[in-house]
């Protein structure tokens, strides 16, 4: 499976690195998704609704999430960050 990083995800990734988050935790999740493995329950992987209804959300840490979707054997990484950063109204 190929990986596509959206422009917004790239910006999120830079912000996460500046926050000194453990990037290895994110890499582990991405590797599992690319391999087609089901994520363990601790990641709380689930479908989103509303404007994000064709996306999934999993928790890297309790308040650090990854929003992604899989289309035609391609993993598309959309966003990553805290709930307040990603879902602010």
Question: Positions of the model-derived regions?
Answer:
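A short, surface-exposed loop/turn module that caps and links secondary-structure elements
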Residues: 32-59
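Basic, amphipathic "hinge/linker" alpha-helix immediately C-terminal to the N-terminal HTH DNA-binding motif
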Residues: 5-9
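Nucleotide phosphate-binding site architecture
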Residues: 10, 49, 87
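Enriched for short, Lys/Arg-rich terminal
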Residues: 2, 14, 21-24, 28, ...
């Amino acid at each position: 499976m190929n990986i596509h990083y959206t422009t917004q995800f790239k910006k999120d990734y830079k912000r996460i690195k500046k926050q000194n988050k453990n990037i290895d935790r994110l890499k582990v999740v991405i590797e599992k998704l690319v391999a087609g493995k089901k994520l363990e329950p601790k990641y709380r992987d689930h479908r989103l609704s509303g404007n994000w209804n064709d996306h999934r959300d999993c928790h890297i840490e309790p308040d650090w999430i990854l929003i992604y979707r899989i289309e035609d054997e391609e993993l598309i990484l959309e966003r990553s960050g805290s709930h307040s950063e990603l879902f602010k109204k």
